[in-house]
Amino acid sequence: PGTPPVVLDRGYDLKEAAKMTVTAVGSDNGILCDGDNLLLYPQEEEEKFFQALKDEGVVLFEEKGDVEKFGAVLFHDGHPVPELVGKDAPVIAKAAGFDIPKGTKVMGLKIDAVGKANVLNKEIMGPIVVLKGYESFEEAVAMAIQNMEEAGGIGHTAGIFSNDRKHIEYYGERIPVARVL
């Protein structure tokens, strides 16, 4: 499975990252396995980054109970529910018990753990980006690797939003994928 983790590095343009995320996840309803599945962002930038996502039309769900409802409808016994694969964001939201604007292209779900601790870290195949904050860049890389080891995606794709060549190299040398975008 392709569950691409993407690290948003400190200092990268938050608005540009939000715009590119919507393009990656929303253009094909998350069917292609090369979009941002898990997006790791600097914790201290959460408010600004979430606003940038909202400005791009992303509907965010931050409350744990709300997010858990998506996990319950998207997966059954740990496997994707075929009826929701590739569906539009409002259709998936409705299945989880929420009404969102009809033209919504992407939803964001804030999680508190990576890997097997949350079923939403698996391949979703829908217009959803899963969001998790990090304290240090090294922690973000470790979480990306853990997520791939536990939820799938080793050998597939990963991404990074960064202007720091050393961070890009650090990520590229450690993340177990065939390509880093």
Language-model segment annotations:
Residues 98-181:
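Conserved C-terminal structural/oligomerization subdomain of aldehyde/semialdehyde dehydrogenase
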Residues 1-115:
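ALDH superfamily catalytic-core signature
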